[in-house]
Amino acid sequence: YTAAFSETPDPNPNYAHLSYEDIKAITASGHVEIQNHSYDMHSQSPRFGSKRRQGENSQSYKAFFCGDCIKLQQLLKDKCGITPTAYTYPFGAITPDTTEYLKELGFKASLGCEEKCNYITRDPECLFLLGRYNRPSGISTWEFMKKALKGSAK
């Protein structure tokens, strides 16, 4: 895919994307998994990622959050034949109740944005709110891994 994108300019080089055909092809390889990162919670305003808005009641929030998750789950199933099992919070914006909502929807794991090492045990609960290291553009793999390894020494 790198060659294809190198030869054909991405319509938005600041935020590359994959088509459903791309997703089908890379998941068929067996080397890549696609997970849920929300259908439409990638703004910072009026809602910050998937976080509950101030003054929003829990019933409305649950309906909104779960509806968004289900929409992407269904699209990926219908168009790509896959069902994500993990959810990654946009911006790492987490509302405490969402872990329970995700479990109700059948998710097996979730990732926040806290840069930390994860200690995986046989307890399935340890798979929720996993830490992750976001790699920004403009930094080498060496620099990125050095930072991540430094974080693991804490």
Task: Label each residue range with its predicted role.
Residues 1-31, 42, 78, 82:
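Active-site beta->alpha N-cap acidic-glycine motif
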